[in-house]
């Protein structure tokens, strides 16, 4: 399937979880049943979805801080899902270069949101750095993600 398509699947799943608020594990398992997914695809998707879910308070705090004049509840659920993935990758996935995380998030926003979403996502993610990690997060925790 490839990393781009896997990221897109993860974003759709996060969006679905944000909208439906039903059994998370059941929805993840259903999404991972897709026969076109490789073992690597499944691992990436599950890792992103679980990681974003676990770090949502941190990710949302960063969005609130960086999105000047915007509140989380005013963002579309698509934009929120895209931003959470982008920030999660930037902060917790050292195997994914910063520029790739930003570019992929921008492409998802352009594809699934409104015409201004790509620029909004790009501008916000450009402001994110490892310095945004909460103080209690150790370097070892970041490296193990």
UniProtKB/Swiss-Prot annotation:
The keyword Transcription regulation applies. GO terms for molecular function: RNA binding. Keywords: RNA-binding, Transcription, Transcription antitermination, Transcription regulation. The keyword Transcription regulation applies. GO terms for biological process: DNA-templated transcription termination; transcription antitermination. It holds the Pfam family NusB. Disulfide bonds: none annotated. SUPFAM superfamilies: NusB-like. One of its GO terms (cellular component) is cytosol. Signal peptide: none annotated. Belongs to the NusB family. Involved in transcription antitermination. Required for transcription of ribosomal RNA (rRNA) genes. Binds specifically to the boxA antiterminator sequence of the ribosomal RNA (rrn) operons. NCBIfam families: nusB. This is Transcription antitermination protein NusB. The gene is nusB.
């Amino acid at each position: 399937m490839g990393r781009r398509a896997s990221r897109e699947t993860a974003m759709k799943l996060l969006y679905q979880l944000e909208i439906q608020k039903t059994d998370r594990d059941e929805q993840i398992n259903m999404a991972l049943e897709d026969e076109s997914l490789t073992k690597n695809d499944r691992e990436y998707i599950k890792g992103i979805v679980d990681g974003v879910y676990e770090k949502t308070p941190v990710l949302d705090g960063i969005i609130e801080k960086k999105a000047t004049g915007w509140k989380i509840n005013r963002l579309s659920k698509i934009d929120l899902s895209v931003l959470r993935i982008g920030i999660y990758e930037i902060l917790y996935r050292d195997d994914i270069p910063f520029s790739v995380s930003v570019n992929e998030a921008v492409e998802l926003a352009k594809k699934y949101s409104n015409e201004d979403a790509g620029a909004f996502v790009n501008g916000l993610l450009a402001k994110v750095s490892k310095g945004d990690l909460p103080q209690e997060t150790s370097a070892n925790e970041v490296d193990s993600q």
